[in-house]
Amino acid sequence: ELLRALNPDAKFAAGETIRVADVGVGELPDVAKIEVDKSEVAVKAFDASGKLLAFYPATIGSDTLPTPNRALISEGAAPNTNYTYDPKKLNSGKADRLLTIQPGPNNPVGAVWIDLTKDTYGIHGTPAPHLIGKRSSSGCVRLTNWDARELADAVKPGVPVVFVS
């Protein structure tokens, strides 16, 4: 899927030159748009000219707690943040009261939180990278911690986040 996204016109025939991901790029240039592709269960980052900068496998919302269907805007990123569970806003846990989980290995939002304009929704890391690629979040978009950090470092407030099917 990644190779097809990088080479939409390729036939993948013997001897054909194609683009491949350079996973050792280090820092991303500034991201101008984020696309959450629900059908590919992935996050794509683009520069201002529309060039694909990064492709990250992701976890998205489940059927009962879906990921949004509309465009949102990034409001900023918070590394190593607290996670606050509010049963009035998120009815997916067993707790019946407000809980705060400090930063660390068991924090549900992992190493970084990219805040979005819809209350309680964001793009974030995870303490369980083996679950990436599943449809099991509470509506947010999960990435591995290393991917979430890389993306957060390149995203400024005001970047559009578009959800596509």
Can you say where each PLM-predicted feature lies in the sequence?
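Extracellular LysM carbohydrate-binding repeats and other cell-envelope/extracellular binding modules
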Residues: 4-33
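Immediate flanking context of iron-sulfur cluster ligation sites
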Residues: 126-135
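Short beta-strand-centered segments at strand-helix junctions
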Residues: 137-152
